[in-house]
Amino acid sequence: MLRSIPRRVPRRLPIFTTTATAGGPSRLAQRAFTCGYLRMSPSSLPPVQPPVSSTLPSDSYQLLSTADKAGDAEDALYEQQIKDVEAWWNSPRFEGIKRPYSAADVVSKRGSLQQTYPSSLMARKLFNLLNERAAENKPVHTMGAIDPVQMTQQAPNQEVLYVSGWACSSVLTTTNEVSPDFGDYPYNTVPNQVQRLFKAQQLHDRKHWDARRKMTPEQRKSTPYIDYMRPIIADGDTGHGGLTAVLKLAKLFAENGAAAVHFEDQMHGGKKCGHLAGKVLVPIGEHINRLVATRFQWDMMGVENLVIARTDSESGKLLSSAIDVRDHEFILGVTEESEPLAETLQAMEREGAAPSEIDAFELDWVKRHKLVTFDEAVDAHLEAEGAPQAARDAYKKRVKENPDLSITRRRELANDYTKTPVVWSCDIPRTREGFYHYRAGFPAATKRAKEFGPYADLLWVETGDPNVEKAAKLAGEVRAALPGKKLVYNLSPSFNWMGQGFDEASLKSFIWDLAQHGFVLQLISLAGLHSGATITAELSRAFKDEGMLAYVRLIQAREKELGVDVLTHQKWSGAPYMDGIVGAIQSGSSSSKSMGEGNTEKGEFNPLVF
């Protein structure tokens, strides 16, 4: 964004110095202080366009006296920020992004103090990377990390870092109460993990930078640079509540270092891992509101962080509400009149039926009553009435032309072709919680992706199996409506990859095959969790019988062979770096340096021989 402010805002602030005289303090001098752009020496590095970090108009405003803030100055700041925001929104960064609010809506809610956030720079870095890979039909593929160790080992190889809500729920919550991925952990859990990893990235970046300054220019040129500042992509689950909760969560993510966050269209309180049963979806409009709330919060903060919209409708079979007509074509009902299922179950409970009896009755009821969409009910009704195929096809053609017709309008349309009213109810089979049954599958997922697309930077459809052909069909339909839209694919460890019919060649090319269809961001969400479990299990079993031989064979020798920097874990953790800082502050005391004499890492790790 352009960072300037009209001239009518005072730019020169009087700062007075005083001295005591017989008559009291007197004004001796007046020094002008100018609030403007940061003055930097000319740089050989290319400028960032548009700038991400620069002096903000609000900086000038904050340094005015209180008396000067009222009136013209505040109006000038407000008007300038509106112009800046509008120019920002018209930049290539937000091409194709829809906002149902105005720049004035955002600026009026910002307050007079603006800040800059490092996560916005990381977001620009991610945006540029995704654009570069998308232009080449190549992937940005990464793995979930659960701690700073995994982050540092991925940094030389993966270009982005992923933080999974599943992993946080099962490994590290802010209450230390670990559990399955039901989205019921405190909402600051994943942002805290993001902050932990973001701070670790900065430590290892500083450590690496310091180590390179000790090299000669020739050594620096020949030594590969490790970029520890990889953009972090994080799991926002359902947003953890209503829209105000989404706002606060989005703010926390941006403050803590996340470059991008994904939000899924499941119901808060009914959320399940995307590969579990029992998922409850929210109406299309409700999830769009979450995406808009996230964008609004980040617009208020002036950050470019990326919004990722995820849908679980390929397998989610329940819907929290039927209020959105865009969902109506996929809502299921029954074609015979009967007592509502929920009322029957409540009556059984009041009469003392055992939970197992109630569960068995509900399961049997659903099997006995075929669940169909209203359009399927109309077609069956026309067939039963002996209507000609032309009438059946005509109805199908009309609803295909306008798939967002409500159930009410569909009934009116059906009456044009039927002799008697269609019997169909989506309320009779509602669950005990009041949820509607929903026709999950790729048609529903495709529609939702298209609806979410204008409000999101990337789209993620959670799928039930790894299949390039299915993914390609989905991508083709979505990108026909949203040209160039970038897609996300979860290379989930929940899939039995060995049982999917892959040979080595197709398994190896899977990621790159997907990238040809627009799946530019791909991730193994729980790779860190599984890799840690695997090596720990192997070491634990061997250590039981082999003792230190197992540790040296499985860990130290492998660290040496692979060049893993954690082999010298004191150095990895930054001990020499901190010694350097302390040494710059205070001379002498070399005997108290952590990496001095007595440090067992010093000279200990020569090649290990067996």
UniProtKB/Swiss-Prot annotation:
Record's keyword terms, sorted: Lyase, Mitochondrion, Transit peptide
GO CC field: mitochondrial matrix
Disruption phenotype: Impairs growth with propionate as the sole carbon and energy source.
Record-level Gene Ontology MF annotations: isocitrate lyase activity; methylisocitrate lyase activity
Catalytic activity: (2S,3R)-3-hydroxybutane-1,2,3-tricarboxylate = pyruvate + succinate
The protein's annotated pathway: Organic acid metabolism; propanoate degradation
Location(s), subcellular: Mitochondrion matrix
PANTHER family: ISOCITRATE LYASE/MALATE SYNTHASE, MITOCHONDRIAL 2-METHYLISOCITRATE LYASE ICL2
Family according to the record: Belongs to the isocitrate lyase/PEP mutase superfamily. Isocitrate lyase family.
Function: Catalyzes the formation of pyruvate and succinate from 2-methylisocitrate during the metabolism of endogenous propionyl-CoA.
Protein name in UniProt: Methylisocitrate lyase, mitochondrial
Name of the encoding gene: mclA
